[in-house]
Amino acid sequence: MARSLKKGPFADPHLLKKIEAQADSEKKSVIKTWSRRSTIFPSFIGFTIAVYDGRKHVPVFVQEDMVGHKLGEFVPTRTFKGHKADDKKTGKK
């Protein structure tokens, strides 16, 4: 179910503070966050945000086409190792 339009998009306040602080400073560094639920705003474009996937922080460079999506969409939490291979040589006769 989509979020109500009257509520507007959501971004954690602590993440917005970090983005504003880095926009004001000359120094560009990776911004660490645990907020996978935050919506990407146009003010995030050009920043690298390290999003937590449950094990480590994965850096995501925010581009223009990512606006409106959630940060968690770009960092998978599960590692797919493939399906079990069929062993046809040792099959029953």
Curated annotation (Swiss-Prot):
<comment type="function">
    <text>Protein S19 forms a complex with S13 that binds strongly to the 16S ribosomal RNA.</text>
</comment>
<comment type="similarity">
    <text>Belongs to the universal ribosomal protein uS19 family.</text>
</comment>
<dbReference type="GO" id="GO:0006412">
    <property type="term" value="P:translation"/>
</dbReference>
<dbReference type="InterPro" id="IPR005732">
    <property type="entry name" value="Ribosomal_uS19_bac-type"/>
</dbReference>
<keyword id="KW-0699">rRNA-binding</keyword>
<keyword id="KW-0694">RNA-binding</keyword>
<dbReference type="Pfam" id="PF00203">
    <property type="entry name" value="Ribosomal_S19"/>
</dbReference>
<keyword id="KW-0687">Ribonucleoprotein</keyword>
<dbReference type="InterPro" id="IPR020934">
    <property type="entry name" value="Ribosomal_uS19_CS"/>
</dbReference>
<protein>
    <recommendedName>
        <fullName>Small ribosomal subunit protein uS19</fullName>
    </recommendedName>
</protein>
<dbReference type="InterPro" id="IPR002222">
    <property type="entry name" value="Ribosomal_uS19"/>
</dbReference>
<keyword id="KW-0689">Ribosomal protein</keyword>
<dbReference type="GO" id="GO:0005737">
    <property type="term" value="C:cytoplasm"/>
</dbReference>
<dbReference type="GO" id="GO:0019843">
    <property type="term" value="F:rRNA binding"/>
</dbReference>
<dbReference type="InterPro" id="IPR023575">
    <property type="entry name" value="Ribosomal_uS19_SF"/>
</dbReference>
<dbReference type="GO" id="GO:0015935">
    <property type="term" value="C:small ribosomal subunit"/>
</dbReference>
<dbReference type="GO" id="GO:0003735">
    <property type="term" value="F:structural constituent of ribosome"/>
</dbReference>
<dbReference type="GO" id="GO:0000028">
    <property type="term" value="P:ribosomal small subunit assembly"/>
</dbReference>
